[in-house]
């Protein structure tokens, strides 16, 4: 029979060993875990996507730390054995361990070394487990009083690190199994990925070949179209050039025809005037008139804007351009008396004055050369002095002389109207 302790000791401590051990707080020492021989870290060559997949696949359930109670749990004690309640390992520590495992497995040579080390550790742990079991069996059969109890206490304290080692060994085995499975999955996935990559590469090469063929055909068609467009443009340019040349030639012919018609009209008008008036002086001065006609033609070619001066309608344009519109407004209906009205009035009322002044017949012969013939008449009176100098000044003084003569004639016509129908014409000297 084991010896009993004193009453004072019994009141302080629980009676059974299991109750005493369960009441004692268990010190958690993570330093006791065996650290694996870590290899030199290499640069990570794995893709970030694969790492994220691995991290997502191994989800760790959250474990809440259980508070160690100091109460006596009699139900948990069986056959005098004490169940040691340890604080579970926190989540961060498990993640750190797995990170170390992943880093170690990245190297090619690191895998073999780890396998050898883990095998040796597993053997040692199994031997320790067997020793612990034997010790427990022996202690159960011992009934040696206080010494036995003291020995059991010391044994219990020694058992604690053994139990921690056992749990570490189990975790290591689980980790190894998981790693093996992951490697197999990775190998299978890599094979499938390589096959998919090969298929994609072949499809891409076929598409590239088709695109090159399309580009070549499009390039040939584009060249043909460009050449056709160039030929079409050249033909259109030739046609446009031919049309422009035709228009230029037609314009020149029209100009020549108009010039010829003007010359014919001038000559016809002169001949009619010569026949009606029957003046010998005009026949004597035909050579001079031809000179004036040639000079007038040169002026026409030099200044095309002066053709209106030599036509019947040119007088109206001169009056408008030279600022004599006010005269036309004030004096009334001068345009009626300018062209045909003037000739009619002069024929009816002032033919005697025209016959008296033979030197100014040329004014009524040519519409645009009245100033020239006036100067010619003066030349006859003065003895034909310096004919060349006057011819040079004719172009400048043509318009002014014509306008002066017309203004004088219009003033005369007004006088006739005011005085009534008088038979005495006013001279235009």
Curated annotation (Swiss-Prot):
GO BP annotations, alphabetical order: chromatin organization
Pfam families the record matches: HMG14_17
Positions bearing Phosphoserine: 90
Q: Taxonomically, which superkingdom?
A: Eukaryota
Cited InterPro entries: HMGN5, HMGN_fam
Found, by tissue, as follows: Expressed in trophoblast giant cells.
Looking at the keywords, is Ubl conjugation present?
A: yes
- Describe what upregulates or represses it: Up-regulated in differentiated trophoblast giant cells.
Residues that bear Phosphothreonine = 29
Check the record and name the SMART domains matching this protein. Answer: HMG17
Here the segments flagged for biased composition (Basic and acidic residues) are 92-101, 109-124, 153-195, 210-387, 413-429
Numbered residues of crosslink Glycyl lysine isopeptide (Lys-Gly) (interchain with G-Cter in SUMO1): 98
Q: Where is the composition biased (Acidic residues)?
A: 133-152, 196-209
Alphabetically list the UniProt keywords: Chromatin regulator, DNA-binding, Isopeptide bond, Nucleus, Phosphoprotein, Transcription, Transcription regulation, Ubl conjugation
Q: Could you name the Gene Ontology cellular component terms for this entry?
A: chromatin; nucleus
Tell me one GO molecular function of this protein.
nucleosomal DNA binding
List the biased-composition ranges (Basic residues).
Answer: 35-44
Q: What is known of its domains?
A: Specifically targeted by its C-terminus to nucleosomes in euchromatin.
Job of this protein? Preferentially binds to euchromatin and modulates cellular transcription by counteracting linker histone-mediated chromatin compaction.
* Entry's family note: Belongs to the HMGN family.
List the protein's name.
Answer: High mobility group nucleosome-binding domain-containing protein 5
The record lists the organism as: Rattus norvegicus (Rat)
Lineage, uppermost ranks: Eukaryota, Metazoa, Chordata, Craniata, Vertebrata
């Amino acid at each position: 029979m084991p010896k009993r302790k004193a009453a004072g000791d019994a009141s302080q401590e629980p009676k059974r060993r299991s109750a005493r051990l369960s009441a004692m707080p268990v010190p958690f020492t993570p330093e006791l875990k065996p650290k694996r021989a870590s290899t030199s870290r290499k640069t990570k060559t794995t893709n970030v996507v694969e790492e994220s997949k691995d991290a997502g696949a191994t989800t760790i359930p959250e474990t809440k730390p259980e508070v160690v109670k100091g109460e006596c749990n009699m139900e948990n004690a069986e056959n005098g054995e004490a169940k040691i309640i340890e604080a579970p390992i926190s989540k961060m520590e498990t993640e750190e361990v797995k990170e170390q495992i992943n880093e170690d497995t990245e190297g090619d040579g690191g895998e073999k070394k780890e396998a050898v080390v883990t095998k040796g550790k597993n053997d040692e742990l199994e031997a320790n487990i067997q020793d612990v079991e034997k010790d427990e069996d022996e202690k159960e059969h011992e009934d040696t009083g206080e010494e036995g109890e003291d020995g059991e206490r010391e044994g219990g304290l020694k058992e604690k690190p053994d139990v921690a080692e056992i749990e570490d060994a189990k975790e290591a085995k689980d980790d190894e199994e998981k790693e093996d499975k992951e490697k197999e999955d990775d190998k299978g996935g890599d094979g499938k990925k390589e096959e998919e990559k090969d298929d994609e590469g072949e499809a891409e090469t076929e598409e590239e070949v088709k695109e090159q063929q399309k580009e070549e055909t499009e390039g040939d068609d584009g060249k043909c179209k460009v050449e056709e467009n160039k030929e079409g443009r050249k033909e259109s340019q030739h046609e446009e050039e031919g049309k422009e040349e035709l228009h230029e030639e037609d314009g020149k012919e029209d100009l020549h025809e108009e010039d010829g018609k003007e010359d014919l009209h001038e000559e016809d008008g002169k001949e009619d005037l010569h026949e009606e008036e029957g003046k010998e002086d005009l026949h004597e001065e035909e050579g001079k008139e031809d000179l004036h006609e040639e000079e007038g033609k040169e002026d026409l070619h030099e200044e095309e804007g002066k053709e209106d001066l030599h036509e019947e309608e040119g007088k109206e344009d001169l009056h408008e351009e030279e600022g004599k519109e006010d005269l036309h407004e004030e004096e009334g209906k001068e345009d009626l008396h300018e062209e045909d009205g003037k000739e009619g009035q002069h024929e009816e009322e002032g033919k005697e004055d025209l016959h008296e002044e033979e030197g100014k017949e040329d004014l009524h012969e040519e519409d645009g050369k009245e100033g020239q013939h006036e100067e010619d008449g003066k030349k006859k009176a003065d003895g034909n002095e310096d004919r060349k100098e006057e011819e040079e000044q004719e172009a400048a003084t043509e318009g002014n002389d014509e306008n002066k003569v017309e203004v004088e004639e219009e003033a005369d016509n007004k006088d006739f109207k005011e005085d009534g129908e008088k038979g005495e014409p006013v001279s235009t000297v």
